């Protein structure tokens, strides 16, 4: 059975670089996911982020979740719930403009820590994008530039808690989907599992590891790499007991008006004429408008819809 890729970045700047790049390439081509250790973010800092996130949930969100329609309604449910997720979340925007100062129920120390956390994750995301460029034979900075709209990239963090669920067979913590954006960095619970990815028709656990950062690729990297790398379906299962699962996912995405298309250098290398036409050219915001309505469906029809829209020309979008 294939082993989930865990990549140690400790020697990325010395004689271990070639091996690490090879591991990243294999993970991007065959998994769409990997887990990073020795990524440069101090363990003590991650411990602080985790503690403050858990404290905030208990103080501000736990009781609120128990009072939701979903929480109360599940008690009477007899059939599988397919239109909602068993999660308690809030979202922080970082780029192009931060909304952290406007989050009234976050205390000042938590705001400060999350701003610092976001900057560290932003730097790590950009470092990873350049490692992908190196593997792809693209110039350094190509992927970062590809994500730039008129205001730069979009970067935000989804903070999630998955409370214990009384009927885990009837509802998912988060339904199966691929991520729409670019590269996603996840700081997840190291004690409670639940995140799974779909590989070769089987659901495989993403192992909880203390102080690790899970990385997965979004739809936009599949397009830009002309299918060499793939976004992968993943989901979160619910748990019946324990303290619940914490998840902090940071999404480094294209700017809303960024124009996304396969890198010409990667298309030129592809001798298969049919494959050259698989991925469309589109504005990221247009893709997101489509994605929001069909997030929990297969990605391929989204690509086909964007390609059809592009082929119809300007009149179709007027």
UniProtKB/Swiss-Prot annotation:
Biological or metabolic pathway of the protein: Alkene biosynthesis; ethylene biosynthesis via S-adenosyl-L-methionine; ethylene from S-adenosyl-L-methionine: step 2/2
Reaction catalysed by this enzyme: 1-aminocyclopropane-1-carboxylate + L-ascorbate + O2 = ethene + L-dehydroascorbate + hydrogen cyanide + CO2 + 2 H2O
An MF annotation (GO) of this entry: 1-aminocyclopropane-1-carboxylate oxidase activity
Cofactor entry: Fe cation
Class of this enzyme: oxidoreductase
Tissue expr: Fruit.
Biological-process GO terms, alphabetical: ethylene biosynthetic process; fruit ripening
Keyword annotations of the record: Ethylene biosynthesis, Fruit ripening, Iron, Metal-binding, Oxidoreductase, Vitamin C
PANTHER family: OXOGLUTARATE/IRON-DEPENDENT DIOXYGENASE
Protein name (database record): 1-aminocyclopropane-1-carboxylate oxidase 1
